[in-house]
Amino acid sequence: MVEKIWFENHPLKYLLWPLLWPLSVLFGAISRSKRQQFQTGRKQAYQAPVPVVVVGNITAGGNGKTPVVVWLVEQLQHLGYKPGVVSRGYGAKAPQYPLVLNDDTPTQHCGDEPKLIHRRTGAPVAVDPVRANAVKALVELDVDIIITDDGLQHYALERDVELVIVDGNRRFGNECLIPLGPLREGVERLQEVDFIITNGGLAHQGEISMSLAPSKAINLKTKQQVDVSELKALVAFAGIGHPPRFFNTLESMHADVKVTKGFADHQDFDQKELEALALQGANVIMTEKDAVKCSDYAQDNWWYLPVSAQLEPKDAERILNRIKEVKATYGSPSA
């Protein structure tokens, strides 16, 4: 129902307006106050010894940030840099912080997105609610560029480049602040960022167009790869910010989907529930982010669908050149 109020102009929005509007005003006041404390110097933000690139958004929910983080890490690695990624680790609780991931780190400790990023890129990834501490842990590993997965509103960490990801189809919904709308900050905040990347839909003037390109489905147990259209009677589920995006992708690939099930973003799955869900079809298909959470008990007919961010070469060059410019000001040998 929240999604309908935020993005579909549901009539319930007007019924709840007297209750939610004051809360949105309060949310905005608190948000602005927190930022102003760092802007005016009343609170001191941490300045990392290496460039910090934020990949975030101004709306709640998933817009495609993680594929952009993966893309950016891979691009920087190709250029000879040593990027590392910091994250809050939403939905997880580590025994201690900062937590630097390894191949055996359970998602319950680090979160699904950090685990996915580490697995896809091999880059160092650190999780800490205090992102500055995660940055310090990565700097000790000789990382020379920091990328923050989310964290646009985490003003306790200074940043050099800001990339904001926008859902090109849903945009900013009713353009109201949380809880009446999906906005973490007002749309005017976009005037201050370096790049606005639009995921799907039609990019507006000044925005960079991006698409998510799916590849072959990968079996969780055997790593076999097949075209998703070859899998019959699929049960599709997704625990991401906007599950219908995944289901629409499957439809566009002519997948034989019989059942769909959406879960909350970062939800910790119940094994028995997924196993019962799997009985409704011949194969199970999920997102890569979901796969990192249930690989330990995956069955032979469970598959996931990786996606990769695709940008026009000229737009990719603009982003990378901006990061190179910033990197040069730090005077590192790898600049």
Curated annotation (Swiss-Prot):
UniProt lineage: Bacteria, Pseudomonadati, Pseudomonadota, Gammaproteobacteria, Vibrionales
Annotated EC: 2.7.1.130
Biological role stated in the UniProt entry: Transfers the gamma-phosphate of ATP to the 4'-position of a tetraacyldisaccharide 1-phosphate intermediate (termed DS-1-P) to form tetraacyldisaccharide 1,4'-bis-phosphate (lipid IVA).
Single Gene Ontology MF annotation: tetraacyldisaccharide 4'-kinase activity
Annotated positions binding ATP: T59, A60, G61, G62, N63, G64, K65, T66
Keyword entries, A-Z: ATP-binding, Kinase, Lipid A biosynthesis, Lipid biosynthesis, Lipid metabolism, Nucleotide-binding, Transferase
Protein name: Tetraacyldisaccharide 4'-kinase
PANTHER family reported in the protein's UniProt record: TETRAACYLDISACCHARIDE 4'-KINASE, TETRAACYLDISACCHARIDE 4'-KINASE, MITOCHONDRIAL-RELATED
Family under the similarity heading: Belongs to the LpxK family.
Catalytic activity: a lipid A disaccharide + ATP = a lipid IVA + ADP + H(+)
Any one Gene Ontology BP term: lipopolysaccharide core region biosynthetic process
Record-annotated membrane-spanning stretches: none
Superkingdom classification of source: Bacteria
InterPro entries on file: LpxK (IPR003758), P-loop_NTPase (IPR027417)
Pathway per the UniProt entry: Glycolipid biosynthesis; lipid IV(A) biosynthesis; lipid IV(A) from (3R)-3-hydroxytetradecanoyl-[acyl-carrier-protein] and UDP-N-acetyl-alpha-D-glucosamine: step 6/6
GO annotation, cellular component aspect: plasma membrane
Pfam families: LpxK
GN (gene name): lpxK
